[in-house]
Structure formats: structure tokens, C-alpha cells
């Protein structure tokens, strides 16, 4: 084993920036719709693509910002996790970059993340489950500023990805069929 990272729950599902993470996650049956490949791709139906990343946060620099500045970077209120109104939410806010509508529908992923930390560094371990890697790839491109619109996610000025991988997770039905 080259690396072992331990995540933990922090306060009321907040990450180490102090914001609640996963506020916009799909609920109920919408979770499966976002995360599981459907019958339109029968050989892979019931499976999911999983993208994982470990971010290191510059928390010392982040904590020098006041709450209002942090809220402008995230696009939500720190206390109640309420999305800022469009007229005051910057286009470079994290929420502005990752909430994407295509053909009148919001691209969905199911996200799960945990804060992690050592004596020397700390950040967020992130996993996205999705029926289409295109949604995750576009969110990531918009965060990193590679979509050609001249914008990037300001949160990336305080956070850097140090690891990342993408996997396909087959359905239990597919795995069971391998035994036969």
C-alpha cells in the first residue's frame, strides 16, 4: 500500500472550509437516476462510473478571508448553506461552475466527500458516482477553467488535486453473472 488516508465527519457534514458539502445531492430515487447507468446502455446497466480525487486545501490562506468573501467563492451562505441569489453570486463561484444545465436539465452526479488531515496537511477526499462521465468531466473542466469561457472556480485557488482516478463499478447482477 502506497498511501492510506483516513476521512472523518466534521461538525454537521461540513468540510474543513466550514461549508456543508453535498447540499445539492439528489434525494431518494433521484440518487439512483444520477448515479446508475440505465437500460439505454444495457451491457453496463446498473453500474456506475466512480471518480475519486484527493484535494489539499490551503486552510491558512482560506481562514484569512472573512465569511462574506468565502461565501462569494463557494456561492452559498456558510451558516445555512443557502445558495446565493444569481444577481450577487459570481460566475466564478464553485456553485456557478459545477451546477450545469444542458437541454433544460441539470447534469447530476451523486457526490460523497470526507475531510481528511495529517499533522502537515489537510483537505477533502471526494468521490463522484455518475451514469455518465461526461457530466463529471464537464464539471471538472469548468472548475479548472479549460472550457474556453475565460472563467475558473475560485475555490481552486485554495485547493489543489493531488490524486485522482476514475473507475467503472459494474452492477451486482453483472458481477454475479461472472460466477457462471
What are the roles of these predicted feature ranges?
Residues 1-180:
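Long, histidine/aromatic-enriched segments associated with O2/redox biology
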Amino acid at each position: 500500500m502506497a498511501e492510506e488516508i483516513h476521512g472523518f465527519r466534521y461538525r454537521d457534514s461540513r468540510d474543513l472550509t466550514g461549508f456543508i458539502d453535498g447540499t445539492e445531492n439528489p434525494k431518494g430515487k433521484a440518487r439512483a437516476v444520477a448515479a446508475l447507468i440505465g437500460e439505454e446502455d444495457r451491457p453496463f446497466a446498473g453500474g456506475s462510473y466512480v471518480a475519486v480525487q484527493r484535494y489539499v486545501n490551503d486552510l491558512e490562506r482560506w481562514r484569512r478571508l472573512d465569511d462574506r468573501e468565502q461565501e462569494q467563492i463557494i456561492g452559498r451562505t456558510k451558516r445555512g448553506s443557502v445558495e446565493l441569489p444569481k444577481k450577487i453570486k459570481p460566475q466564478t463561484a464553485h456553485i456557478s461552475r459545477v451546477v450545469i444545465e444542458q437541454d433544460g436539465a441539470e447534469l447530476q452526479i451523486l457526490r460523497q466527500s470526507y475531510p481528511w488531515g495529517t499533522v502537515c496537511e489537510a483537505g477533502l477526499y471526494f468521490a463522484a458516482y455518475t451514469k455518465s462521465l461526461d457530466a463529471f468531466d464537464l464539471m471538472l473542466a469548468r472548475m479548472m477553467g479549460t472550457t474556453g469561457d475565460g472563467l475558473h472556480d475560485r475555490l481552486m485557488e485554495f485547493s489543489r488535486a493531488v490524486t485522482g482516478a476514475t473507475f467503472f463499478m459494474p452492477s451486482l447482477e453483472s458481477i454475479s453473472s461472472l460466477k457462471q
